[in-house]
């Protein structure tokens, strides 16, 4: 199975390829005409999966660079129809610089070396990848249950949440890990958090969860739970 790794930057896009247990730097392309170049490469190399780096701050927070990379991943998903995953790319550039110094690789290939590191991370542990969906499923909350409460919407599986705009609560926080969900909630004007360390569960009256979330993870929480209705 051929997997394409991508390190997305503001001006350049690093590419790497794997057909087995390790990856190799491939090339670096510019943003100009990247869709055509990628389409040709994907066809030529018989690519079946695409892995894109997710830039995060060192603490793990999402940033403007994160949002750009997520939007790019959605474009690639729409363009190719292939399975697309994102993985944490923190320190990939540091790794690339180290490898280049040791191997004498040209500076121009730095982004491709970073892409290879991103790809290797996915190959070592595919479960760490966030899959980018072509079509998002909808969920639903019951606004009346949340009236005048301090509410935490915890890790919704989709940003398409019917009733979220009608919630009239005392306070609303949203925690989400998935980059695509984060991007769309942010674009709707919400300010989601993506670090559990930022949460104090004792501050909330109600935590809204989906059916797959275990309740034992919420330490020091004495309030009630509401179920997010998802397909």
Labelled PLM ranges:
Residues 2-6, 10-145, 168-205, 209-215, ...:
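Phosphate- and other anionic-substrate recognition elements at nucleic-acid/protein interfaces
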Residues 148-159:
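Conserved class I S-adenosyl-L-methionine
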Residues 158-167:
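Histidine-anchored nucleotide/phosphate-binding helix
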């Amino acid at each position: 199975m051929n997997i394409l790794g991508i390190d997305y930057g503001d001006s350049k896009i690093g590419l790497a390829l794997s057909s087995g247990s390790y990856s190799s730097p491939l090339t670096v392309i510019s943003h100009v005409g990247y869709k055509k170049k990628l389409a040709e490469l994907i066809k030529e190399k018989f690519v079946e999966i695409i892995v894109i780096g997710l830039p995060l701050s060192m603490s793990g927070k999402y940033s403007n660079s994160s949002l750009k990379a997520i939007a790019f991943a959605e474009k690639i998903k729409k363009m190719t129809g292939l399975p697309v995953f994102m993985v944490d790319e923190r320190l990939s550039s540091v790794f690339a610089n180290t490898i280049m110094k040791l191997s004498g690789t040209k500076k121009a290939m730095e982004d491709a070396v970073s892409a290879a590191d991103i790809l290797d991370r996915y190959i070592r542990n595919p479960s760490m990848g966030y899959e980018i969906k072509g079509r998002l499923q909808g969920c639903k909350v019951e606004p009346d249950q949340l009236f005048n409460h301090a509410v935490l919407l915890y890790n919704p599986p989709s940003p398409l949440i019917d009733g979220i705009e009608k919630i009239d609560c005392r306070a609303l926080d949203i925690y989400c890990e998935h980059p695509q969900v984060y991007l769309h909630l942010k674009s709707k004007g919400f300010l989601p958090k993506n670090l559990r360390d930022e949460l104090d569960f004792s501050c909330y009256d109600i935590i809204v969860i989906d059916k797959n979330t275990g309740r034992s993870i919420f330490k020091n929480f004495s309030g009630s739970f509401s179920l997010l209705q998802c397909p």
